[in-house]
């Protein structure tokens, strides 16, 4: 594989992640965040994608100290957006997993709708062939991130 093109692709991927995140946070209607912070919304999104997760793993995903996650979880628990699930392997509190509640999923539906509405004008004029390519590339990357077959 051409090293220069690979470097260009990786740099573009990182830039799209950063610029896309900034764009979405700037464009999303503030009403979506009237009850929770952006960091709490990101935590809910992680739980939706990953399923029941330990606080330590959540800290790793958000690249913050466990105390920051504890504070976020406390607020989300008080609002009924997450709940503790017992880990089947162990019985102490340290082994409990946090899970999203139906109320938390409802907040995420509002957030997903706001993200869609913010990004739609940017993507709406991309032709079908390029859109198919984007979906195909993201599907391959997602599979590779999860340790799947590279030839999918």
UniProtKB/Swiss-Prot annotation:
Please report the stretch or stretches of sequence annotated as the HTH marR-type domain.
Answer: 3-143
Gene name tied to this protein = ydgG
Q: Which Gene3D superfamilies does this entry report, sorted A to Z?
A: Winged helix-like DNA-binding domain superfamily/Winged helix DNA-binding domain
Please give the DNA-binding region boundaries: 55-78
Keyword terms: DNA-binding, Transcription, Transcription regulation
Task: Give the protein name, as stated in the record.
Answer: Uncharacterized HTH-type transcriptional regulator YdgG
Q: Among its keywords, does the record have Nucleotide-binding?
A: no
What SUPFAM superfamilies does the record point to? Winged helix' DNA-binding domain
GO MF term list: DNA binding; DNA-binding transcription factor activity
Identify the domain of life. Bacteria
Q: What is the lineage of its organism?
A: Bacteria, Bacillati, Bacillota, Bacilli, Bacillales
Is Secreted set as a keyword in this record? no
InterPro entries (UniProt xref): HTH_MarR-typ (IPR000835), MarR/SlyA-like (IPR039422), WH-like_DNA-bd_sf (IPR036388), WH_DNA-bd_sf (IPR036390)
One of its GO biological process terms is:
regulation of DNA-templated transcription
